[in-house]
Amino acid sequence: MFPLGSVVEVITGERGFVRYAGEVENRKGVYVGLELLPEFAEFGKNRGVVDGREYFKTKNNEKTGIFVPFDKCKLASSISSSPSPKIDGTAASIGMGFPPMSPNLQSSIPRLTNVSSSSNLSMNTISSTALTPTEKILQKRIEDLLYERQNHQQQLEEVLATVDQLQSLVTNFNDQQDEVDELRERITLKEERIQQMRNEASQRRFEFKTTIECLEESSNRAIETYENRIAELEAQLEMYMSGKSEDDLLFSLQQERDYALNQVEILQERVDTLMKQKANSSTANEKLSHMESSSPTLTNASFESPKRGKGSNDLPENHPQRRQTLEFYEIEIEVLREKVEKLQALSDEKDFYISKLEKSLDRNDTTPVPSDEKLSNYAAEKENLVSRISELEHTIEQLTINNERDNERMSPAEFELETTQEVEENDSDSHDDEETWCEVCETNNHSLQECPTVFGSTDEA
């Protein structure tokens, strides 16, 4: 048997290193697996693989392997320079366990290829016939050492290549670390923005839910109010359709007419009050301007008083804003007068319908009419009167709202110069009527819960 790594020569003249010695599958006898020398590489037949089974590996996985029967090869007579054989996978993985080396380490390591090969050249000239057994042993030892040197050199080159690769990876990692930090920061900002948007969405859902609940509650209240009003109207209609007497109908119409006239008188009184307030305001402003011009102390006190606003009464008499305010009050008063006249016209029209009903009653006394036809006529007349009354109530309501707005727009300074007696009377009246005061009609005849303007007239029931 030839030792592994020894140089063997085939009978055909090819030389190579012994990589395998033993049996080959599906072959009889003992075979020697050789990795041919570079000068005989063209005669190679395989890469150390036979029938799919790998027996050895060739350098760079080249096709330089050959299997020869043991009896057709012999030990080479001389030593020649041989290429660095390819080590197996276990030897190639040795370099991965070394620690990182500095970039200058590769240049500082001496290359084994620089060693002079004069000893090899001189040994090639030694004839195999002139070697003694001791020299043959030494020759074998030299061949083994050369083979080990080639393996070590190859391992060192692979380690240096691995170091270079690791250094490039470290450099790339340092370059990419900044990008990774930037990406992490952007991800953090995105997460904060997403959390903020989620909080805003939750708040909006809560507000929307609260608004929906408020709307539902308001809708339920309005529905309940309308249902109660509809029930009252249906009850009134049933009472009218069941055969209510003509006298009762006429009496209710007269009461409604009186109520409308009362409302007209109240509105007329309000118009007169506004006119008086306007006259008192102009007189008070003249007195106030005279007092301010005559007394500097009073002027300073008036400006320092927190109760006096900066309305139109604080301005001089010939100031454009003051004149504009007075003109506005005059326009409002004219509008109220027109509405009062319109209400008076509606009241006259209602009187006409009442007189017409009285005539029809007188005529019915002489010429009786069937009860069904009479009730239908009364129902039609009643519907007309109800529509007229609703229009009148709507007009009164609008007039009341406008009057309240006018009272809100008036400056508090207009009422500062009223007499003490009028203030006390108003305070006593408001105190007496506090329990039964209607904010819509501004009267003490009934409370807000019993207001006919809002819930309809109680006389209809």
From Swiss-Prot:
An example molecular function term from Gene Ontology annotations: microtubule plus-end binding
Xref: InterPro entries: CAP-Gly_dom_sf, CAP-Gly_domain
Coiled-coil parts of chain: 134-418
GO biological process: cytoplasmic microtubule organization; establishment of cell polarity; establishment of mitotic spindle orientation; microtubule cytoskeleton organization; protein localization to cytoplasmic microtubule plus-end
Cell location: Cytoplasm, Cytoskeleton
Positions of the UniProt region annotated as Disordered: 278-323, 417-437
Residue numbers carrying Phosphoserine: S82, S84, S289, S294, S305
Positions of the CAP-Gly domain: 22-69
Keywords: Coiled coil, Cytoplasm, Cytoskeleton, Microtubule, Phosphoprotein
Ranges annotated as spanning the membrane: none
Biased composition (Polar residues): 278-303
Statement: the UniProt record of this protein carries the keyword DNA repair: no
PTM sites of type Phosphothreonine: T367
Cited SMART domains: CAP_GLY
GO cellular component: cell cortex; cell cortex of cell tip; cell tip; cytoplasmic microtubule; cytoplasmic microtubule plus-end; cytosol; microtubule end; mitotic spindle astral microtubule end
Function description: Has a role in stabilizing and targeting the growing tips of the microtubules along the long axis of the cell, directing them to the ends of the cell. Acts as a cargo for tea2.
Subunit structure: Monomer. Interacts with tea1 and tea2. Interacts with tea4 in the presence of tea1.
Protein name (database record): Tip elongation protein 1
